[in-house]
Design a protein with these regions (language model features):
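Hydrophobic, well-ordered beta-alpha structural blocks that scaffold small-molecule cofactor pockets
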Residues: 13, 18-74, 79-82
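Structural motif
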Residues: 44, 104-105
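Residue-level detector of alpha-helix initiation sites
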Residues: 52-53, 114, 160
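Short loop/edge segments at beta-strand edges and connector loops
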Residues: 72, 90-94, 134
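Glycine-rich, highly charged phosphate/nucleotide-binding loops
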Residues: 83-101
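ADP-ribose/adenylate-binding Rossmann-like module
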Residues: 105-111, 116-143
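E1/E1-like adenylate-forming module used to activate ubiquitin-like modifiers
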Residues: 111, 132-182
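An accessory alpha-helical subdomain
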Residues: 160-247
Length: 247
């Protein structure tokens, strides 16, 4: 486990009490995260902790089709309901290392520092993705704030420095990027097959799509005005312009 990110239980306890000198997390701010989107469909996702935060994490994993397993002796009503309807598997006991077997991603959402450290250390030994909620020293990945509209997802992260600031930025981004952006993404996806089959190089395909997105008239403004037909005409015109000339 990275020494710069984790210096033992004392460091974690100080961090949670707000008296940490921050040396244990400074490296996280100085080293940029590798941003990626994970495909969770059908993958086992472990959540340890049955409180409201655990419920929030479970709902996020379910929204991405993860196969969620909850480990907790007790759970809030929302989690109980998800287990009762079969949406999640609920193991009603304290965490054990074997719970990580065949697991893709683990999230610890308990208020017990010892359990959180055990989950982190056990997952690190398995080279597994693990996040202990609100304790950056016990994370090898962090969960950004997400603005999601249809296929459009925008992630906002402060590298764990300030979740509150990330949420403020999320609200501002959500106001700026509305449903018209998601609709344009869907419309552009409809011609991806044509582009791959017709335009011979990556640079050709890049120029085709950028010509639509950044062209005039602005497709976003057209969609804001409800003129989807005009956007389809823009796309059709770009197809004619970029298609290779017949031999």
């Amino acid at each position: 486990m990275p020494a710069a990110a984790y210096q033992g239980k004392e460091c974690v306890c100080q961090f949670r009490r707000g008296i940490c000198d921050q040396t244990c997390v400074q490296g996280m701010l100085e080293t940029p995260f590798y941003i990626a989107c994970l495909k969770l469909t059908g993958r086992r996702c472990l959540v340890v902790g049955g409180g409201e935060i655990g419920l929030e994490k479970v709902e996020g994993l379910l929204a991405c089709d993860g196969r969620v397993v909850l480990v907790a002796p007790d759970a809030v009503p929302g989690l109980e309901a998800l287990a009762a309807e079969g949406s999640i598997e609920w193991i009603r006991r304290e965490y054990e290392p074997g719970d990580l077997e065949r697991t893709f991603i683990a999230i610890a959402a308990t208020d017990d520092t010892d359990i959180n450290i055990r989950v982190y250390e056990d997952a690190e030994r398995r080279a597994m993705l693990v996040n202990v909620v609100d304790v950056p020293p016990l994370c090898n990945f962090i969960l950004p704030a997400i603005v999601r509209t249809g296929p459009l997802a925008i992630a906002i992260s402060t590298a764990g420095a300030s979740p509150a600031l990330a949420k403020r930025i999320k609200r501002q981004v959500a106001e700026e990027f509305g449903s018209e952006y998601a609709r344009l993404a869907v419309m552009l996806n409809e011609v991806r097959g044509w582009a791959k089959g017709t335009l011979p190089t990556y640079q050709d395909r890049k120029a085709f799509f950028e010509g639509i997105v950044n062209g005039a008239p602005d497709p976003i403004e057209l969609l804001r005005d409800g003129d989807e037909t005009a956007v389809r005409e823009l796309i059709a015109a770009a197809q004619r312009a970029y298609a290779p000339a017949a031999a």
